[in-house]
Amino acid sequence: MPAEAADRPGDMADATIDAFHRGAFFLAQPAGRGHRAGLDAMILAGAVPTGFAGNLADLGAGAGAAGLAVAARCPDARVVLVERDAEMAAYARRSLALPQNAALRGRADVLAADVTLSGEARAAAGLCDRAFDFAIMNPPFNASADRASFDDLRKRAHVMPPDMFGQWTRTAAAIVKPGGFLALIARPASLEAILSALAGRFGEASIVPIHPRAEEDAIRIIIRARHGSRGGPALCPPLVLHHDGNALTSHADAICNGTASLFGD
């Protein structure tokens, strides 16, 4: 996902323009600071079925990586990039304005809104009840006790506030239609908190452990669950990212470059 040179107007002078899905779409991202999208966002996007057709909310979208990855792979998907940080929302708008993303622009929008809002405040911000068929989220999942960053933009993107999973899944349950889906990526240590937050809201949770290499412990989990279902969770076969070296496995490469879905659907 190399950075490419581009014209950078005004307050985007510190942006890099980065290719994803082997050039299927591009992102404007802050250079040398803040959160920069990578494999996590691409794997999360892979949790959406290739044949998905409907409205999808990318909650905490940042510059738009996961949502635009869905739009690039699913030609009938309509995506809203939801981001509360004004600076990152500006990068998401810049991403949509890139000429390389012209084919996606008619199916994607940016909404500056706080995912933790509730009730009338949430609806007034543009997150209306039952407006979406699918929601994805890559929320901050570093504990506040973890090594702190001196980069405020990065810290806002990475540090988990109290009851975050409860607040974010509450919003997802409000905006996703019954029978729709939520997919999220997190650390394995958060599994209990996530399942607790999903309880009574989303069921049939399919859990995919993400391993750097076959012999190494999982570093991420992907969970996909159905709104309104009472079905129990299921542990799925893992996704192994790398061979013994740093090259991606064929399965991981297909998912991360938009030619396959994580669940094979």
Predicted regions located by residue number:
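Short, low-complexity, intrinsically disordered N-terminal peptides in bacterial proteins
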Residues: 1-22, 98-107, 121-129, 261-265
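Conserved beta-strand segments of alpha/beta enzyme cores
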Residues: 26, 78, 107-109, 203-206
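Conserved Class I SAM-dependent methyltransferase catalytic core
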Residues: 28, 33, 37, 162-218
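Conserved SAM/SAH cofactor-binding pocket of Class I
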Residues: 40, 46-149
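Residue-level signal for inorganic ion chemistry
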Residues: 44, 168, 225
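SAM/dcSAM-binding transferase cores
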Residues: 217-265
